[in-house]
Amino acid sequence: VLPLNRKGALSVLCINTWHTGFHGSLWFDDRSWQLIQLVECPNCIHMFLCLQGADAMVLESVMFAILAERELGPKLYGIFPQGRLEQFVPSRKLSTDELSVPGIFDEIAEKITRFHGMRMPFNKEPKWLFGTMEKYMDQVLQLTFTREHHLRNFSRLLSYNLPQEMDSLKCLLESTPSPVVFCHNDLQEGNILLLNGRENTDRQRLMLIDFEYSSYNYRGFDIGNFFCEWTYDYTYDKFPFFITNTKKYPTKAQQMHFFQRYLLESHAGFENLSEEDQQKLKEDMLVEVNRFALASHFFWGLWSVIQAKISTIEFGYMEYAMARFDAYFELKKKLRV
């Protein structure tokens, strides 16, 4: 977040890095960052520095601009070769436990439905999920570790024959109908803002952020990933800096409530269907979403193994990878697939 002077120009900056935990870092002005709490938009903006390739940056900026225009994300004020200037939104991130709070839960369902209804100028073939997982798998199989606990956990992961397991998962999901929609692909509490001043309102109090993984993908993955995130708390202040509780995975009743809200928003004429037909659509989504939740565990498990090797952020990435693969096999057993 950067302070602006009265003419809208940036102040002189002394940039330092502030690690934020699971996914990355923010940059702040060492001289003036504490003043941020005293100013309001549009007196301050958020500067996003992008370290990825130019093509990816252009695509993400186009996506960001469209989402901002449709009020599904922060406003876009400008772009430059290595990043962009975004609206600073006075807010706080949700906590893990808030994901299941009924009013918040309902609005998240509405936001996801609107997101999935977007028509974006990108390739609509659902290549992102397994294309990315195959790339991650290739990287994982080439990794080496020297730290003893990393070696021990990595050896255990390799004993699962992950390439064969991924092929099995791919076959399962190819036989599982799931509409291709524009997905966020990283729906977790840290990417959902509760807007200041709207905490006690019934609607329009939330905003989705962080669209770096967004693409056309299977609906089941986006919702399944969101359900998986109910079980992970990334605010724990001791190593490995997260807590897993798979018992917090949404119950069937909670999932069916979510599907009801989702289908009311997305399925034309859903409210006019018979109760039996509505139930059938929700039962189909139950199978779809929980099977794709397996892909969420597998995807972020592979991602986290790579982060254990390359990331400088203080987080137990290898432990997180183990937690995700443990949850994968636990859910697979429960689903009997």
Where does each model-flagged region fall?
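Active-site acidic catalytic loop and adjacent metal/ATP-binding pocket
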Residues: 3-13, 17, 21-28, 32-37, ...
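ATP-binding pocket architecture of kinase catalytic cores
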Residues: 20-37, 43-161, 168, 172-179, ...
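Structural signal for hydrophobic/aromatic residues that build the beta-strand cores
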Residues: 64-67, 76, 86, 115, ...
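Extended, well-ordered alpha-helical scaffold segments
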Residues: 104-108, 153-165, 258, 314-328
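A general structural signal marking secondary-structure boundaries and capping sites
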Residues: 112, 116-123, 144, 173, ...
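Helical subdomain adjoining the active site within ATP-dependent kinase catalytic cores
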Residues: 150, 271-337
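Short amphipathic alpha-helical segments and their helix-coil junctions
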Residues: 205-211, 260-286
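Active-site activation/catalytic loop segments of kinase-like enzymes and analogous catalytic loops
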Residues: 221-274, 294-312, 327
